[in-house]
Amino acid sequence: MAELDGIESKLFTARDFRLESGQSLPVLELAYETYGSLSPARDNAILVVHGYTSSHHAAGRNASGKQGRGVAAGAPGWFDGLIGPGKAVDTNHSFVVSVNALGSAHGSTGPNCTDPRTGKPYGPTFPDITMRDIVAAEKLLVDSLGLKSLTAVIGPSMGGFQSFQWAASYPGFMKAIVPSVTAPRSPAGLDRLEALQARLAGDPNWNGGWYYENGGIAKTLEELRFETLMAYGQNEILAETMPDPKAREAAIRANAKAWAQIYDGHSMVTLRKAIGSFDITGDYAKLKNTKVLYVQSPSDKLFDIALSPAYVSDMRKAGIDVTYVELPSNKGHMASHADAALWAPILGAFLKRLQ
């Protein structure tokens, strides 16, 4: 099967982006990648949105020097098992746009970006944002590409939140959404915001949040990342090819250390706040004309699968066409991409029915 090579990270720019809070960002930048070609009728576009600390590098491999901020040279995209020529999201037929969320640290406007009004990083002054703000920014990108509709919005975890929010904010704009390892509302305590803020503030270089010129807080970020990867199921993923537990731990710690050099603590807080306030369960009526392929995994420790039947039942009662799939995966919160083969045929068939 052919692969995607030579992918370039691109940048969309807009001015004076107004947030729900009433505050405005003088400059809005969104990093993104595209795969495949837009049809003459401009009717074959799919939007892919990422999880909490992921990037917009969802598929293929970047051209030399053309990767987004913090993306390792030559690294495959995190949804590479699903996106590409002949794959479930078939780039021979679909034009795929993958975007880095507002507030993230992989090239889009976020706390580590320069505030044009001060010439310094926003840092702790970056305004609070909501999932609605994140999606509204993405809509500007989609509009700039001349897309009048989307076939689907696809995303895991926080990307699933975004897909649900897309359907609620812009009903009828997309034919379907494909949220995975996620829920239509943020479960109580998922954000663990106060604990995160306390951990970050405990770093000796915190300096009231102005750590950029104070040595940074990479050590604390490294510890947080290691804990997150373990909770997400990275140990189980590596176990298939790395039987030695010590070797797995060393590999995960190396991953965490590399990530900590490029990510930003304030981005973690900003996105956690958006995650904590997310809830579209009161907007189900807006999703009546949007098909939903909802994918969960029993091994996911972040989103309790016991809650899924009630979500599905409530959506169906609201008249939403929901297809519900449980993945027999032991990969935890990473199931939808680490075990992509388990549901690739289901996703491929679902998308073909939308064409």
Model regions: which residues?
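Conserved hydrolase catalytic core segment
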Residues: S149-D191
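Catalytic active-site module of serine/aspartate enzymes centered on a nucleophile-bearing elbow/loop
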Residues: V312, R316-Q355
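Alpha/beta-hydrolase-fold enzymes
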Residues: F173-A258
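Conserved alpha/beta-hydrolase "acid-adjacent" motif
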Residues: K301-A310
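Conserved acidic catalytic loop of the alpha/beta-hydrolase fold
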Residues: G119-T125, R132-A152
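Active-site nucleophile elbow and catalytic-triad environment of alpha/beta-hydrolase enzymes
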Residues: S267-Y284
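Short beta-strand/loop motif that positions the catalytic acidic residue
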Residues: Y294-Q296, D300
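N-terminal cap/lid subdomain of alpha/beta-hydrolase-fold enzymes
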Residues: E33-D115
